[in-house]
Amino acid sequence: MVQLLGLDSDRPVALDAVGTLLVPAEPVPETYRRHARRFGATLHSREIDLRFQQAYSRIWSPQLSTRTSQEIEKARWRRLVHEVFQGSVRSKDSLFYALWQHYARGEAWRLAEGVEAFIQHLNREQIAWAIASNFDQRLHSVVRSFSALRGARFVFTSAELGVSKPSRVFFKRISEVLSHDSPLMIGDSLSHDIHGALQAGWQAAWITTKLFRPVEHPGLVFQGSLEALVKAVT
């Protein structure tokens, strides 16, 4: 079964971070609301959630360039906070920095269900694994906060690679570091993690708890929850 799923000691594994390994410790709208209250905002979580989703879809539109950097990512998050709280807080920049720093800390996150068991399996089978995320340099401090994640061979972020998923360049640069043409990408985003990896010639495992029609592709070796993947390989 391990061989069938593309998991073997000769093939390195790259795991997405947010949504796959890590999830926010509390709902994002509630975190935003709690921090914004210190700066005079009175928006409810539902309104914040709506504004967040609208701003996020504009700022990280799939039609935009995948080129990125630490400065670009920080500017994008600043713009998002400004748009969400337009006209409702005294100092949007101060709120932005409070939120930016909050999500750089481990307590802002928790491990997703099944992560510890899956990482233990990789370590037991001596399978090299790395983290590959559309994130910025803050991810390093977050990863260090979780003992289960400290065994990652590398932590790749789009901000440091200069390009984000689903660009083939993102995966090519990681392949070069891992010295392997076809690692296994495990992630929850069909467009960024799965399609991006498959188009780059990688294998992929799609982590999802939703009922979708199975994706037909010879490189897609698994589709389901992380807990189901753990059961399949142990």
Where in the sequence are the language-model features?
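N-terminal helical cap/lid subdomain that shapes the substrate entry/recognition surface
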Residues: 2-116, 124
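Asp-based, Mg2+/Mn2+-dependent phosphohydrolase catalytic module
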Residues: 1-13, 23, 46, 90-94, ...
